[in-house]
Design a protein with these regions (language model features):
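Short acidic/polar active-site loop segments enriched in Thr and Asp
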Residues: 15, 130, 153
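Acidic, His- and aromatic-enriched active-site or binding-groove loops in soluble protein domains
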Residues: 41, 152-161
Length: 191
């Protein structure tokens, strides 16, 4: 369960870097402790907000909730904003089908200006523009440029591995957690 995973990280002295520290790390400008982890949760699901936020508050651990802001985003930010969970963009209204052939998300088929406008709207609602999660993990070079032009310093994909020095801060991988995994499985993924 989430609480035992967070408790494990705290008891084993994991460090929780900011998005700016992640950017500096992958660009080779900052050394992070070996035991560093950024906790991210996609979609801003009410179940995560109701069940997860109290855990992060209890252990004083920061996490990022990537929010689809067109899905009641303003109310979620108002109701759930706290010192430990930061809302970042999962787009305003791009988490839907309709992309170019070979791509799932509509983001890949949008004009640059429309994409940047969507991203800027989501930043305004979230109150933060440090990090972005590509809808469906799907992107093109044009999507990356729109993310950069909207002002994000980091963006995450669904590539399943750890971030390394030399990675593009706007195309970061993530280690995927599986709902219902055992604590031992979790430990194997983070160590």
């Amino acid at each position: 369960a989430l609480e035992e995973e967070i408790e494990y990280l705290v008891e084993n002295d994991y460090y929780f870097p900011t998005w700016e520290e992640v950017r500096q790390y992958v660009e080779g400008d900052l050394l992070l402790p070996e035991k560093s982890v950024v906790l991210t949760f996609d979609d801003g699901a009410k179940s995560f907000l109701d069940l997860g936020i109290p855990v992060f508050e209890k252990y004083k651990v920061p996490a990022t909730s990537f929010l689809i802001t067109s899905n009641d985003g303003e109310n979620k930010v108002k109701e759930y904003q706290n010192d430990y969970v930061t809302f970042q963009s999962h787009s305003d209204n791009m988490h839907r089908a309709g992309g170019n052939i070979g791509h799932g998300g509509i983001f890949t088929a949008m004009s640059h200006d429309d994409a940047v406008a969507d991203l800027e709207k989501s930043i305004e609602i979230c109150g933060h523009g440090d990090a972005f999660a590509y809808p469906y993990g799907d992107y093109t070079d044009e999507c990356r440029t729109a993310v950069q032009d909207a002002g994000f310093i980091c963006a995450v994909t669904t590539e399943n591995r750890r971030a390394e020095v030399g990675d593009d801060p706007l195309l970061l991988p993530r280690v995927r957690m599986i709902l219902g995994q055992s604590l031992d499985s979790f430990i194997a993924l983070v160590e």
